[in-house]
Amino acid sequence: MLRSRNRALSLGRQSQGRLDVPLMLITAALTVIGLIAVANATIDPYAVSEGTGIFSVLSRLTSNSFYWQLAWVGVGLVAIVLIQIFDYRVYGELAVYIFGVALALLVLVLFQTAGRGNVTAWFSWMGGSRSFQPSEVCKIAIILTLAKHISRYDGPIVKLKQFLPVLVHFAIPFGLVLAQDDVGTALVFLAIFLGMLFVSGLGWKIIAGLGITGATACVVIWPFLSEFRQDRVLNFLNPSRDTSGTGYQVRYSKIAVGSGQLTGKGLFQEGAISQLDFVPEKHTDFIFSVTAESVGFVGCLLIIVLYLALVLRLFYLSYKMQDRFGALIIAGVASMFLFHIFENIGMTIGLMPVTGIPLPFMSYGGSNMLANLAAVGLVLNVVRHQQKTVL
């Protein structure tokens, strides 16, 4: 074990290439757009402005959300730099300890008395005015440790004795997140797991078993879901079922998106439906709706193109990796982003059930911003330490 760790530590001095510029540019663009979106969602367009330009916007903000988001971007950038200190294979050697810390955080948060609704997924600080969601950063830990576990197998996972330990590895943190009643984040964990399995390769018997088990689990779990969770699924299947109750969010979200039309009503402008607080959680879960109303179809198309470029770039990098461990890390990050993007945008326009997961780089939330930037930092580390140049 000591010899393997010394070997991993020496890797940091070998085959260090350049950071992936396309990935960095895409991430930077989405982060800047996200900061603008948070400011747009938290402004009072009717307030008297002080100054001109950006100072006019800042003087009309209704909360400190923009400043906190900016601060978390700074923390995330520091995380990217710190992640580059060691070769990613060093982190792989520490996978057992990283997994242990992640599980400890997921267990400790269950004992928090304060939560949001029935969800106990946050550590509160600063007298409860600020919070931190450990499951967000635990996504990175799960990606790293699962990649290390799966990479021990030279080829596709075709035997049950190979698959079961990997399944248990995933099931423990997945179950702890479900115990927090955070179904959205649990589904992200599931997407990461399935994405990494797909890239690693699976035998057809295991694929069939997963399909049957998944379908059976949905039937078995349904009666045990809270009425609120069931309503969200039923409202998705029948949008007109309860438009003034649990379907209220999606109803006004779709109205806001549609009212943006081709070019939008403009950023920081009066007369927006979302600015009148008809859209709940407008700077977090439903920030895409607010942004769509402001920038219209054209602006939304640009944002979606950037997200598509992000995911495609990640899967391309995963494909080009010579190292199986590195390829699986990038595949896990790509799967995480893909599910977040598809689910969040889908729920704002009624194509997916509402789960409450944020839109990467855009939704307000420090824990998620830190996790997103740390994930990008990990990918940059993998690419930088590959001997073969990735175009």
Model region roles, listed by residue range:
Residues L2-L30, I36-D181, I345-P360, Y364, ...:
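Membrane-helix boundary/helix-loop-helix interface segments in multi-pass membrane proteins
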Residues A41, L167-M196, S226-Q230, A292-G299:
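Helix-loop-helix junctions and helix-breaking kinks within/between transmembrane helices
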Residues L70-A79, E293-L312:
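Hydrophobic alpha-helical transmembrane segments
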Residues V107, K139, A171, L194-G195, ...:
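Hydrophobic residues within the alpha-helical transmembrane core of Major Facilitator Superfamily
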Residues R116-S131, A208-L302, Q322-G326:
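Hydrophobic, glycine- and aromatic-enriched re-entrant/interface helices and adjoining loop segments
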Residues A186-L197, I212-A215, L308, V376-G377:
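Hydrophobic transmembrane alpha-helices of multi-pass, membrane-embedded glycosylation machinery
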Residues A256, R313-K320:
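Small-residue-rich helix-loop
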Residues L317-T355:
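Loop-to-helix entry and N-terminal half of a specific, functionally important transmembrane alpha helix
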